[in-house]
Amino acid sequence: LENAVGLAAMVNTDHLLMERLAQALEREIGVRVELGGVEANMAILGTLTTPGVAVPLAVLDLGAGSTDAALMTSDGRVTSIHLAGAGNMVSLLIQRELNLPSDANVDLAEMIKRHPLCKVESLFHVRNEDNSVTFFKEPLDPKLFGRVALVTETGLTPIATEHTLERIREVRREAKRRVFLRNALRALQQVAPLGNIRNIDFVAIVGGSGLDFEISQMLMHKLAEFGTVIGTANIQARLGPINAVATGLVLGYLQRTAQR
């Protein structure tokens, strides 16, 4: 990355302030509101609903604004850390580096971050970014011919830029390395026993950015150097990596209710 610059900062939350917010919300909606607990603890509770997952367990919560890590030991103790910079920062770096149109920069950069690329070489085939070729029975839209496009669930989406496929791919991957990979390693090192990632056996990825098609693979290759296994969580065996904290909040509430 040569031109992109971004700044992210974490804001410390005060328990008393959160209590006041809960009280104000309770007065506004007329429903009892209580603090559910620390986000990292809730994320681990939710992640434990993934089939085959058990403690000791480390969780990487890759969201939009922060990269969070938590480690639960066999005796139930939880260590956590929150670092600024995650999905939104990656999108910002992609937008700035590629100088994408300002009228649709956020959505386009977000799509580039999430989807693989291809080059439309004819009306019946495209060359994917991994150099494989996909053929089509029906002709593609002539407006796509010669364009770099995103391979999405709804079809091919052309990118309004003069940059080559190789350039876009490199910018996307470098932004993810600078933000996700670097922050993930920093976070895991701070929660790992003795500050050594080698002491973590298994890591589960949760959060919206866990849906990304290549982040888990990038992390897998890097953590293999430490002998650490990493995989994407499947919350409640059906939700994938999302809703870990929400699931943990519900489970935590049920546990507190049962103890009353």
Predicted regions and their residues:
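Gly/Thr-rich phosphate-binding beta-strand-loop-beta motif of the actin/hexokinase/Hsp70
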Residues: 51-78
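Nucleotide/phosphate-binding catalytic cleft detector across ATP-hydrolyzing
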Residues: 1-56, 104, 119-122, 128-178, ...
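Contiguous, well-ordered alpha-helical segments that form the cores/surfaces of helical PPI scaffolds
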Residues: 42-46, 68, 92, 96
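Short acidic (Asp/Glu) and glycine-rich catalytic loops that position anionic groups and cofactors
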Residues: 70-75, 86-91, 160-165, 227-229
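Catalytic-loop motifs flanking and including active-site residues across diverse enzymes
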Residues: 86, 90, 180, 245
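Glycine-rich phosphate-binding loop plus the immediately following alpha-helix
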Residues: 76-121
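Short, contiguous, pocket-lining structural segments
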Residues: 9-17, 61-63, 82-86
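A short acidic Gly-Thr/Ser loop motif
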Residues: 59-67, 84-87, 207-210
